[in-house]
C-alpha cells in the first residue's frame, strides 16, 4: 500500500493535496464530476457481477458484508448452469443442491429460485419426515425437481445413504459456509466430496467472516482453513475493502493534534463541576423497580453529553451545548409529573445554568474565541482553510456542471420523445440558489461519534466562517441519523426530523452545502456524493467503521484525515496497522486484485513506444488514441451505450498468461455494441500493457465501423451515419414565435377553395351546369323533442327548391345531412342538366336573386362584404327551381324571380292603409304558407315570422292573456295607437324565422351524438300546449313576404349546405391528389359511383325512455354532474343579429300568467317588477327568477357548454328597463375555474361521455360513433351502393377525409381525434418497422432518436404544410354571419378594416379564431360575455357565436364608431378603456361585470355585444355546439404579446400541432379505408420514408404478389395486392416502393453458435407452450429475453432493438383493437384506454403473470431485487392494477407512500417478445395479435367497461385550480419525492425512483384523501 502518510504529521507539516493544488489542473476530480471515467483501468463492474464471474469459473467462497447479494449470486449461478439440470436424472441431467443451516431458511431460498427461474424446486426441511423416505420416494423427488433445497441434516442423510450421489449434482451451494470450520454437517458433506471423482461445483456463501475486532493473523488463518475445507477460493466483495477497489485510494493522514493547554483554567473548572455532578447522581441510591423509569437517566445522559462536548471540543462549545440542553430540559420539566424525577431534572437545569454563567465570565458567547476550543478543532479549521476556493472569475464555464451522468441528476422524463411541454415547469434550475460550483471545491464529511458533537461542531464552524474570511466559503450542515435506518416504523415527530435530515442530504447532494457533519450513521447505506475530504474527528474503533468512512472519500483526489489526540496516537497506530493488514488480506481475496495495477501506475509514461498510437489524418496532428488513453476511450464508449437505470454497461477484459511469461488480453464490449466479436490483443510483457493494447486495437475497430467519430469520441445518437433518415430540413424563416410544431405556435393560412367552384360563375352564352339541391326529410324530429308541438314541414312536400348554376362540373360527393327544425334532412347535389346556355339578361336576373337570397333573406351582407360575382374566388349562382308546366321536371323558375322583383314587400314594409271604408279582408289561403312582417315596428330591419297556425276561434276582441289589457285590440290601441278595421279576423300564431344558420349538427344532441339533458321536458310540454307562451299577431297589422315559407325554410339551409358541399369537395380534391401522388385510389371516380352518405354514426331517433331518464342517465354519466340538472340560463333581451338597436316598445304577446315562484330571491321580485310593463314583467320575472335562482342554488356546471339549453323567453324589455339591472341577472355561467367537478383542462367534449361505473346510460344513449363507422362497415364488406367499387380501391370516402381535416374546435358532428389516434399509432409502427429493418446494426438509442425526429410534431407539421393541408382543414365553428363568405362575395378591403383584427393593438382577449380556451387562459376567466338581446326570439333564432366571433358585424357599428377591434393572444392586457371588459373572477349574482361607465354605453354597442358570444346564453332547448378544447388553442401568456391579424372569411389561424394531428388523422383515414400497404404508400408520398425505394427497372419484381404479401401484414386488413403498388402519377417519378425485408441475421457468426444457443434457451419450450407460439428461429426468442447486462450471450443482440419494435407493434395492435371496438369509444376514452393499456405497468404485470421473468437473462443485482419485489407484490395482489407506472403497496401506510417500483425491464421483455414473434412470423401482425390478445383480453375488457385514468390527470380534473405539484426533491436514499398541494385540503407526498412515479404516487394519495372527504360527489 503506498499510502502517502501513515506517520503522524506534526502541525507544520500538514500537506493536503486539495484539488486546487493538484498537478492535474484545478478541475480534476471535483466532486460534482460525479462519475469520473477511468483512464487507466477498465470501468469496474458491480462487485456482485465480478463474484458471479468467479463462481462460474471455479469453486468459490463468497464473503459479503450483507445478505442481500448472496441470493443474487446463488440464483444466477443456478440459472447459468441450468442447462445441465434439465431433463431426467442420471444419463442426461444433474441436479443442483442448496444447503442451508436451519429449516426456516429453506423457504426463503425456495421462493428466490422459484421467482427468478422456471426450475422445479423441491424443499426438504423436516428431518423426521424426510428421514423415513425410501430410496424410491427420493428418486421420485429427484425426477420431479431440478433444484433441491435442504437443510444440511437432510442432505447428509441423503448423501450418506446414497439416495443421490455427488456425481449427480452439478452445483452444491453452502449457505453460511463459515460453519464448516466448526464441527458441522457441512464438514461431513465436504469429506464425502474428497472420495468423489467428479465433484460438483461448489459455492460457499458467508456474511460473517468479519465480526467486530479481529486479529489479522486469525482472520487469515480462518479464511485459509475455510478454503481448504470447501476446496474453494475465497473471494471478498468490494463492500469489505474500500468500496471501489479501482478508484484511486484516498490519501490517508493521521494528524497528531497536540495536547490541550488550559491557560485560563476554565476547562478544568467546568470539568470539575460536571464530574462532581455526575458523581453525585451516581451516588444517589435511588431504588429502581424493574418496571419504573430510572429517575436519574435523563440527567446522567445530559451531563455526560455535556462533558463529552467539553472534552472533545472545549469550553466554548460546552457553553453552547449547555444552552441547548437547558431548552430541552424545560420541556421535560414541564411534562414531568413525578416529584423525584422532577428534582433531578431541576438539579441538572441549575448545573447547566451555572456552567453558562462560568463561561460568561471568560468570553462573550456571541463571538467565537479560539482560545476556548480544543487543538482538534483548531486542526480541523486549519484543514478546512486549505480547501478555500480559488477566485471565481478564472472559470466561467459551467457547462459540465450538471452533467447527465451524475448520480443525482434527476431525469425528468421517462419517454423518448417528449413533445408535450407538460412538465417543463417542474425543472428546477440548479444554479439559482447557490453559488456556482467553482466557488466550491470542497465536498467533505466530518464523522463524529455523538449527536451533540455534530450539532455544536456545526455551530462552531458557522461561527468561525463569520469571523475568518478564509472559512467563509464553508456552508455546512449536520445530520445525526435520527431514524434514518430503512425500515423502522416512524412516529410523527421522527417523521419531521427525518424530513429535515433528508433536506440536509438533498442540499449536500446538490452541492448547496459543501460540508456535512455526521454521526456514523452516514457510514453506510446513505446515498451521498463522492467526497474529496473525509475527516474522522473521533478515531474509527473497528475495521468496518474505518472502511466505510474511508469509502466515502471517493473523488479522484481525496484525503482521509484522522484526527488523534497525542495520548491516543500510539494505540491508534496499532489499530491502523491491523486495519491495513485486514484490508490487505481481504484485498488479496478480491477476485481481481487491483494491487498489480497500482504498482506500476507511475511507470505508464514510457508505454508510448510499446505500441504505436492510432492516429487519424497523421499529417496535420489529427486526433489520436495512444496506448495510455485507449482504455479511457473504451470506458467512455461503453458508458454511452443505451441502458436502464440499473445497468451501467462496462467492458469486460480477461487477461491470460502464456507459457513464455507474456500476457495477452481479450476484450468483450457490452452486447448492445455493434462491435460484437471479442477482441484479442497481441502478447505483451505485462498485464498492464496487454490490457492497454487490446483497448487500442478496439478503438481502431470502433472508429472503422463508425462508432467513434472524427475526434475519436463516441458517436451520439444524432450520428452522421443515419443522416439520410433525418433529412435535416431548413427551418422555415418565420417571424412567428413559438416552437415549430407546438400548440403555442400559430400561423395563418388562406382557406382553400375547391377547384371546381373557383371562378365558376356562369357567363352569358357559355355552356353551364345546373345542379339541383335535393332535400328530403329522412328523420323527422321525434315528438319528445318537438316541444312546441310544431307542425313538421318536410321539404320534399313542395316542389320549388334551390339549385346551383355553375360553369364547371362538380364531382360526385356523398349525400350529407343538415338538421332543421323539422328533423334531419338529407341533402343531395344532383346534376339536372348541362351544356345549356343562358342570355345576359337571364343571368342578370339570376344574379340579382342570388344576392337577394344572401343579403335579404339570410341577411348575411355586411359592410365588410361586397357582392362581386366576377371578382370572387368562389363564385356560382344559387337560384330557385320549380316544376315546369306539367312535365314534372325541375327547371329554373324565371317567373318566380320576376314576381319577387315586382313585389312591394320584397325589401321593406309595404305601406298598405286600411280604413273603415276599405277594411282589411282576411283570406286564409294567403296565410297557409306565408312569412309575415309586423308593419308597425323595426322599420329598418323588420322581423319576419312564419305563420304556424291560424286561430280561427280568437279575434282581436278575445281576452288578452294578461290583466293589464282587456283585449288584443285594446293592447294595440294603448301601446301603438293602432286602430283595427276588422274585428272578426282570426289571430295568427307565429314562429320566428330561423336565425340559426348553422344546421350542420342537430340541436338536441351534442357533438358526441349524446342527447343533451332536457331538463324538464314535461313542464315544457305543458307550457307550449297552453296559450300563454305563444306569440300572437293580428293579420291586419302584418304584411305578407313574397317568398313563401316553404322556400324560406329551404333558404335557411343554404349556408350549411354550401359550406358542407365546399368542405366535401375540398376533401374529394385531396383524395384525388393523393391518388396521383401516392398511387392509392383513383384520380377521378367512375361516373356511376357515389360514396355512401356522410353520417355521424348516431342513432336517428331517441327513444322516449332514454329521454325521460335523462336526468339520471346521461347526467349521471357525465363528468360534470350536478344534482339540479335544470341548467337554465336566463335569456333576456334576446335579439336577432341585424336588428336596429332601438329599444322601442315591442308587442309580441308572450303571455305568462304564472306567479313568481315563492322561492326566488326577494330582491329579484322587487327590482324586476318595477320597470317592466306588466305582461312582460310577469314572464320576465318568472324566467329571471328561475334562472337566477338556479344559479344561486348551486355552482354552475360551467365546463361543458354542451349542456346548456337556450331558454326560451319570448319577451322584450321595455325602454325604461335599466341595463345594469339586466346585467345583474345576466350572471354568466360562472367561469370554469369554479366548476367544482370538472377540470378545464379537459373540456374537450368527452366531458360527458361515460366514465361512470358502467352506468346504464352507455347503452341507452347513442354513443359518439366514428362519423363514418357505419360507412366503414359497409366498405369493409364492400357492399357499397354501386357494386363493384370500394373505398379500398378508389380511396377513402371524402366524408372520412373531411373528418380527418376537422378539428374538434370546429364543433362539428365529427372530428379527427379518433382517426388521429389510430394514425398516430400506425405511424409509429410503420416508421419503427422501417428503421428496424433498414438499420440492422443501429442500437435502440439511435433508432429511437431517428423515430422521435420523424414522428415529431414539428416534422409532421412540416410535411402537412408542404402537402397543403392547413388550407383544407376545418378549424373553427361554422358561423355564417361571422366567418362564412357566401358565393359571389368578396371581402371589401376598404371597409373591412374594422373587420380585420388589427395587429399589435391589444384588447382583452379575443381568443383566436378557433375559439377555444387555451391552457394558459384556463386560469383566467371564461372570457365570454352575454349581452341582453333586444328582442326575444324563438329557440333557434339566436345567433351562435364562438370566441372568434368577437367581430362586429352590423353596418350600424360603422356608424356608431363601435370598437376598434384588436386581438391579443395574451389574456391579460391592461384595461385602459371602458370597452375592454374584464370579467370578475367570480361573477356573483349582484356583481356588475361592466361597472365601468355603463351609463354612457351607447346602444349600438349593445348591439355589438350581442355578437360577442351568445353561445353562452343558450336558450333552453336549443343546442349550441361550442366547447373548448384547450389542447388546441393555446393562446398562452407565454407566447408574449403575439398578435395575429387576419380576415375570418378567407383565412384561418392554426396551431402547428393541429396540422401534425391532421396528418396523423389522414393516415388513420387511409389506413381504415384502404389498408396498411396504402397507408404506407401515403406516408411515402408525404415524404416520410417507411418503405424501401426500388428503381423503375426492378419494378416487375416488386409486383410479385408473393413478396407483396410479406408486407401487407394483415391480409384481412390490407388487400394490398389489389392496390396499385407505385404512384403512376403524371409526375412520372422514378420512385417505386418495394416491401421491407426482414434483416438477414439475428444470430452472430460464431463457431459454436448452435450449441451455445441450445444451452442458453434450455427450458424455453415450456414458455413457448405457455404463450402458444413456437419459434421457427430460436435466436429471436433468446434475443427477446437477453438484457444488455447479460454478457454470457455472445450469439445474439440484447432485447433493446426488439423492444423498440415490439413497443410500436403492441401500441398499434391495441390502439387498432380499441378503435374498432363496437362500443365506439369517444376520443377521450380512447386516449385513456390506450394509455391505461399501453404502459409499462400493465406490460410488466402481464409479463410476470405469464412467467416472462423466469426466463429473463440479466446480470444486474439491482434489477434482480426490483424484479424480486415486484413479483412478490404481484403474487400477493394477483390482480391487475389500472394506470400508472406503479402499484400501491399498502393503503394504510399513510406516512410515506412509496409505490412499488415496476421494473421497466419486465415491460420491455413483454414488448420485445412481441417484436420477436413479429420477425419470426415473417412480419405478421396477425400472428402477434393471436399470441397477445388472449393475454390482454381480460384487461381490455375490464378497462373498457370502466376506464381508468392516471391519478395525476384525475387529480387535475378534480382540482384544476388548486392542485399544484412541487418540483422533485431527492430523498436520502436517492429516490425522488414530489409533494402535491391541494390548496385548502392538504399536502400529499409521493416517493419513487423517478419524478413521474413519485408524482403519481402523490396524486394517488391526494385523491384518496379527497375522495374520502367528499362522499357527496357521485362518480368520483
From Swiss-Prot:
<keyword id="KW-0694">RNA-binding</keyword>
<dbReference type="GO" id="GO:0048713">
    <property type="term" value="P:regulation of oligodendrocyte differentiation"/>
</dbReference>
<dbReference type="GO" id="GO:0050727">
    <property type="term" value="P:regulation of inflammatory response"/>
</dbReference>
<keyword id="KW-0597">Phosphoprotein</keyword>
<keyword id="KW-0677">Repeat</keyword>
<dbReference type="GO" id="GO:0042487">
    <property type="term" value="P:regulation of odontogenesis of dentin-containing tooth"/>
</dbReference>
<dbReference type="GO" id="GO:2000630">
    <property type="term" value="P:positive regulation of miRNA metabolic process"/>
</dbReference>
<dbReference type="GO" id="GO:0001834">
    <property type="term" value="P:trophectodermal cell proliferation"/>
</dbReference>
<dbReference type="InterPro" id="IPR027417">
    <property type="entry name" value="P-loop_NTPase"/>
</dbReference>
<dbReference type="InterPro" id="IPR036085">
    <property type="entry name" value="PAZ_dom_sf"/>
</dbReference>
<dbReference type="GO" id="GO:0061548">
    <property type="term" value="P:ganglion development"/>
</dbReference>
<dbReference type="GO" id="GO:0045069">
    <property type="term" value="P:regulation of viral genome replication"/>
</dbReference>
<dbReference type="GO" id="GO:0061309">
    <property type="term" value="P:cardiac neural crest cell development involved in outflow tract morphogenesis"/>
</dbReference>
<dbReference type="GO" id="GO:0035116">
    <property type="term" value="P:embryonic hindlimb morphogenesis"/>
</dbReference>
<dbReference type="GO" id="GO:0070922">
    <property type="term" value="P:RISC complex assembly"/>
</dbReference>
<dbReference type="GO" id="GO:0099092">
    <property type="term" value="C:postsynaptic density, intracellular component"/>
</dbReference>
<dbReference type="Pfam" id="PF20931">
    <property type="entry name" value="Dicer_platform"/>
</dbReference>
<dbReference type="GO" id="GO:0050767">
    <property type="term" value="P:regulation of neurogenesis"/>
</dbReference>
<dbReference type="InterPro" id="IPR011907">
    <property type="entry name" value="RNase_III"/>
</dbReference>
<dbReference type="GO" id="GO:0030422">
    <property type="term" value="P:siRNA processing"/>
</dbReference>
<dbReference type="GO" id="GO:0051225">
    <property type="term" value="P:spindle assembly"/>
</dbReference>
<dbReference type="InterPro" id="IPR005034">
    <property type="entry name" value="Dicer_dimerisation_dom"/>
</dbReference>
<dbReference type="GO" id="GO:0031643">
    <property type="term" value="P:positive regulation of myelination"/>
</dbReference>
<dbReference type="GO" id="GO:0031054">
    <property type="term" value="P:pre-miRNA processing"/>
</dbReference>
<dbReference type="GO" id="GO:0001525">
    <property type="term" value="P:angiogenesis"/>
</dbReference>
<dbReference type="GO" id="GO:0030326">
    <property type="term" value="P:embryonic limb morphogenesis"/>
</dbReference>
<dbReference type="GO" id="GO:0045664">
    <property type="term" value="P:regulation of neuron differentiation"/>
</dbReference>
<protein>
    <recommendedName>
        <fullName>Endoribonuclease Dicer</fullName>
        <ecNumber>3.1.26.3</ecNumber>
    </recommendedName>
</protein>
<dbReference type="InterPro" id="IPR038248">
    <property type="entry name" value="Dicer_dimer_sf"/>
</dbReference>
<dbReference type="GO" id="GO:0055013">
    <property type="term" value="P:cardiac muscle cell development"/>
</dbReference>
<dbReference type="GO" id="GO:0070173">
    <property type="term" value="P:regulation of enamel mineralization"/>
</dbReference>
<dbReference type="GO" id="GO:0010628">
    <property type="term" value="P:positive regulation of gene expression"/>
</dbReference>
<dbReference type="GO" id="GO:0021889">
    <property type="term" value="P:olfactory bulb interneuron differentiation"/>
</dbReference>
<dbReference type="GO" id="GO:0005524">
    <property type="term" value="F:ATP binding"/>
</dbReference>
<dbReference type="GO" id="GO:0010660">
    <property type="term" value="P:regulation of muscle cell apoptotic process"/>
</dbReference>
<feature type="binding site">
    <location>
        <position position="1807"/>
    </location>
    <ligand>
        <name>Mg(2+) 2</name>
    </ligand>
</feature>
<feature type="region of interest" description="Disordered">
    <location>
        <begin position="1598"/>
        <end position="1626"/>
    </location>
</feature>
<dbReference type="Pfam" id="PF20932">
    <property type="entry name" value="Dicer_dsRBD"/>
</dbReference>
<dbReference type="GO" id="GO:0030856">
    <property type="term" value="P:regulation of epithelial cell differentiation"/>
</dbReference>
<keyword id="KW-0378">Hydrolase</keyword>
<dbReference type="GO" id="GO:0060119">
    <property type="term" value="P:inner ear receptor cell development"/>
</dbReference>
<dbReference type="Pfam" id="PF00271">
    <property type="entry name" value="Helicase_C"/>
</dbReference>
